[in-house]
Amino acid sequence: MEKDLTRYRNIGIFAHVDAGKTTTTERILKLTGRIHKLGEVHEGESTMDFMEQEAERGITIQSAATSCFWKDHQLNVIDTPGHVDFTIEVYRSLKVLDGGIGVFCGSGGVEPQSETNWRYANDSKVARLIYINKLDRTGADFYRVVKQVETVLGAKPLVMTLPIGTENDFVGVVDILTEKAYIWDDSGDPEKYEITDIPADMVDDVATYREMLIETAVEQDDDLMEKYLEGEEISIDDIKRCIRTGTRKLDFFPTYGGSSFKNKGVQLVLDAVVDYLPNPKEVPPQPEVDLEGEETGNYAIVDPEAPLRALAFKIMDDRFGALTFTRIYSGTLSKGDTILNTATGKTERIGRLVEMHADSREEIESAQAGDIVAIVGMKNVQTGHTLCDPKNPATLEPMVFPDPVISIAIKPKKKGMDEKLGMALSKMVQEDPSFQVETDEESGETIIKGMGELHLDIKMDILKRTHGVEVEMGKPQVAYRESITQQVSDTYVHKKQSGGSGQYAKIDYIVEPGEPGSGFQFESKVTGGNVPREYWPAVQKGFDQSVVKGVLAGYPVVDLKVTLTDGGFHPVDSSAIAFEIAAKAGYRQSLPKAKPQILEPIMAVDVFTPEDHMGDVIGDLNRRRGMIKSQETGPMGVRVKADVPLSEMFGYIGDLRTMTSGRGQFSMVFDHYAPCPTNVAEEVIKEAKERQAAA
């Protein structure tokens, strides 16, 4: 039976850590009848935070998916982490959502991770509501946060509710559209509220905001705009229709206030999910791509009768077994179906399908376009793989994940655990593409790489608790890069004669710095056949394979352009392998002449500190070679933004707590690579040589 997709909403809830996302999701589940006792995050018993590490730390690490119902609509809700080290979870969730709720703290306002998540949501063109939470907190200011959304995020909030009372006296909200006040009692029961007239002292404010709301909404419809300008009354249904259109187009973001912890205001946000966020048929269809990742011009149309197109967006091993969270874009997926994984070229039979509720599940027979479900027991699937109809194959646009910025060498504490460690790590890599594992060729050490200290800390925890492997960790290593600063024209001749046919290849070439972020580029300008065209790819391959190791400290070389200008060949002794060898030797010959340099990762660091500790915090950031970008004083303290080298930030959280008597907070995200100062570069090169000598 075909489902009515107009009654579906695939939504994500995302925010900065501690803005109250998971608590908001708990309230949604309570209100929609999914759970009967509310779990409090600060007590470590939240429904959505179901990994032990999450429950202990009070932060959401994995995006838990759950289905619930509100006003005859099915909501598939994904609760995402707010900590910067887990941004990958937010990114991959946004990839498969149709709409979202951005949760902001009423006192903290637009915080660092809010900005990152907002940018990702813009990139993914996800329609959003804004929910300003924690309005019962000291220092909470709804209007200030609305202004910050405009100035910091460059977004247009469409204010839909106004708070009644501030801080401790916050009791409810006014629905601007219906001009009704929702006032909750102090029992903490979300169902115990009354709908009354607007408080007398708010009548003028509500009228002003209502006029702004209607003016903004009717811009979506020329006929209604004309009626409005002529002084005609616009119906609430017409206004809602316009708000829905503008929300879907990302022209504005309906904005609500409340306190999830105190159970005030969440119902109106749920109503808005149904009223204004798009259903699966209202979002642009997913493009299909070829093997090179280029769009083919075909799209996965949201139709249960169309060929199957689905995206595996998360792999998770839980106590029930391996789960593959999947968004179905077109077609129908049923138990017993055979599907093709376009990434591996292998087919697999679907054993069981389940609809998830945090960490419990309900078996289902089939799922259709628009659904988010979990497949149990798939073998060779990874995040970003396309699952499709084997008779009508196609690949969806894959996910792109950021490179890790930190690495640590690990080894098992107990002997004989190497195999167990290897199996555990391969499973963890499958679940989290931003976590990488490799073996150091020289030392044979196992190296793990991730997005930050907390990211790797959690992985060590998972190894110990889930897989029973305790490890010793080395010192964190920074992912340095190398580049060149000068153009060099050079020639290399590879000649080898050892009886019989020899080897001969001559290349004339230019190595030069590329544009920042351009990676490795190769071009051939050979004319006249001195280097036959069939050997050009071999020259490119030789250089391409060489850039993984720089000449200063063995770090990968970035932003390098090589141009093959001329050369020579021998009709008998020349071969592709000879030209490849020439390119590799040419690389080693020319790079030292091109004034190479070490690049270090620079992090965008965002620090919050009470005002009386601001001097210490800024002085400390300067000592860490930080460049202060801005300082902003708010009611709760000062927010300092700075660019700081990653190598200077290890252990910063402990130092910040000491400086601020435990009241400071910070987050950081990779921003760019920049040349190291000479003294730092010399130290990096020295350490690299010592490591190589010890290996």
Curated annotation (Swiss-Prot):
The record's Gene Ontology biological-process terms are:
ribosome disassembly
Q: Which NCBIfam families match?
A: EF-G, PRK12740.1-5, small_GTP
Pfam families attached here? EFG_C, EFG_III, EFG_IV, GTP_EFTU, GTP_EFTU_D2
CDD domains reported for this sequence? EF-G (cd01886), EFG_III (cd16262), EFG_mtEFG1_IV (cd01434), EFG_mtEFG_C (cd03713), EFG_mtEFG_II (cd04088)
What are the tr-type G domain coordinates in residue numbering? 6-281
Q: Which family does it belong to?
A: Belongs to the TRAFAC class translation factor GTPase superfamily. Classic translation factor GTPase family. EF-G/EF-2 subfamily.
Q: Does the keyword Lipid biosynthesis apply?
A: no
Per UniProt, the keywords (alphabetical) are: Cytoplasm, Elongation factor, GTP-binding, Nucleotide-binding, Protein biosynthesis
Q: Which residues bind GTP?
A: 15-22, 79-83, 133-136
By its UniProt entry, which SMART domains does this protein fall under? Answer: EFG_C, EFG_IV
Which cellular compartments is it found in? Cytoplasm
Q: Which gene encodes it?
A: fusA
A Gene Ontology cellular-component term:
cytoplasm
Which species does this protein come from?
Answer: Synechocystis sp. (strain ATCC 27184 / PCC 6803 / Kazusa)
Q: What is this protein called?
A: Elongation factor G 1
Q: What's this chain's function?
A: Catalyzes the GTP-dependent ribosomal translocation step during translation elongation. During this step, the ribosome changes from the pre-translocational (PRE) to the post-translocational (POST) state as the newly formed A-site-bound peptidyl-tRNA and P-site-bound deacylated tRNA move to the P and E sites, respectively. Catalyzes the coordinated movement of the two tRNA molecules, the mRNA and conformational changes in the ribosome.
GO MF annotations, alphabetized: GTP binding; GTPase activity; translation elongation factor activity
